[in-house]
Design a protein with these regions (language model features):
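Ribonuclease/tRNase effector modules and their secretory precursors
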Residues: 1-85
Length: 85
């Protein structure tokens, strides 16, 4: 599993906006990593097997997490491969 540093404000934002607390995020990571894609501004998008997207920065600091649909996953993966365009 990746070593992700969780900040209190980022976890609070993730929970308030998307309903993901630290235990849900860790459970999503436990389900397995489906794909890792480079996003904009040196952010890394981690897609898990249960279609949760976890975004971290270049220093492995947690930024946010949210649920992704299969369609969003395909579109974002293609955008990630094209440098976010």
């Amino acid at each position: 599993m990746m070593d992700i540093k969780f900040g209190k404000m980022e976890l609070l934002h993730s929970y308030q906006k998307h309903g993901y607390n630290k235990s849900k995020i860790l459970a999503a990571l436990q389900s397995g990593i489906k794909d890792i894609v480079q996003g904009k501004q040196n952010h890394t998008l981690i897609y898990t097997m249960d279609l949760t997207t976890i975004i971290i920065d270049e220093n492995h600091n947690f930024l946010t997490a949210y649920k992704t649909s299969k369609y969003q996953y395909k579109v974002k993966k293609i955008k990630g491969l094209n440098g976010g365009k």
